[in-house]
Amino acid sequence: MLPSIAKHAALHHINPLKKHGQNFIFDSSLCHKIVRVSNLEENSRVLEIGPGSGGLTRSILQKNPESLTVIETDERFIPLLNEIKEYYPNLNIIKQDALKINLTDLGYDKVTIISNLPYHIGTELVIRWLKEARLITSMTLMLQKELVERICAMPSTKAYGRLSVICQLIAKVEKCFEVAPTAFYPPPKVYSAIVKLTPLENLPSIALITKVEQITKLAFAGRRKMIKSSLKNFVPVKNEVLTQLNINDNYRAENLTPQDYLMIAACEMS
């Protein structure tokens, strides 16, 4: 029988390292709750980034997935994870930097991602995975609360920005619940939150999303400017294009919906 999450880490003399942005979760009930809101189905193929002390890993494995692949860059955790594997042979362990691996490298046709992501690489991983959304069933992620609010933000709100647009064009986004700093060891300085992203059935092309990224970069660089001014250097976007698309050219970047940005991008590419 495996020891408790905290005791398991202690037996291996593992303490959190600040350079890796590590904050351990020892509360198994929280781990179970994260997996529960993911609606993970049996026989799914699952990916977890940064399993660390293995709390979330255990909760995922208890749902009997076909396989769980964990990617861990800190070699101190590998012996601990191998001990979990003795009880769950469907656990695959890869020692690697998650930023150096694409989903296609792992041979997935479909994968469910459940992770407590290190804060310092969370945004980059989310954007990268969204561009591989055709391979993803859903992503249930723990991130900084502020980042989750940006992902889920609606137009004309302070948190709304490029990340909101890109995420919502590719996935249905849902803020599930917040997590207090006291749930971690050591406690971080900020609140966290769980967000679930489920890729849409009709996904925009990568080329179209890339064009949206270019347009939103210009638009939100001057988010208080009128859209006709902030996009004036984006040659294809003339005022008549905005009129044709029924977009008020006196709007600011934060007033346009994700679909507005998609239409502008599509018009430029046509």
UniProtKB/Swiss-Prot annotation:
EC class of the enzyme, as a word: transferase
Pfam family, one: RrnaAD
PROSITE patterns attached to this UniProt entry: RRNA_A_DIMETH (PS01131), SAM_RNA_A_N6_MT (PS51689)
One of the record's GO molecular function terms: 16S rRNA (adenine(1518)-N(6)/adenine(1519)-N(6))-dimethyltransferase activity
EC number: 2.1.1.182
Keyword rRNA processing: yes
Keywords recorded for this protein, A-Z: Cytoplasm, Methyltransferase, RNA-binding, rRNA processing, S-adenosyl-L-methionine, Transferase
Ligand binding (S-adenosyl-L-methionine): 23, 25, 50, 72, 97, 116
Location within or outside the cell: Cytoplasm
Catalyses which reaction(s): adenosine(1518)/adenosine(1519) in 16S rRNA + 4 S-adenosyl-L-methionine = N(6)-dimethyladenosine(1518)/N(6)-dimethyladenosine(1519) in 16S rRNA + 4 S-adenosyl-L-homocysteine + 4 H(+)
Cellular component GO terms, alphabetical: cytoplasm
Function: Specifically dimethylates two adjacent adenosines (A1518 and A1519) in the loop of a conserved hairpin near the 3'-end of 16S rRNA in the 30S particle. May play a critical role in biogenesis of 30S subunits.
Entry's family note: Belongs to the class I-like SAM-binding methyltransferase superfamily. rRNA adenine N(6)-methyltransferase family. RsmA subfamily.
NCBIfam families the record matches: ksgA
Protein name from the UniProt record: Ribosomal RNA small subunit methyltransferase A
Species name: Rickettsia canadensis (strain McKiel)
Source organism phylogeny: Bacteria, Pseudomonadati, Pseudomonadota, Alphaproteobacteria, Rickettsiales
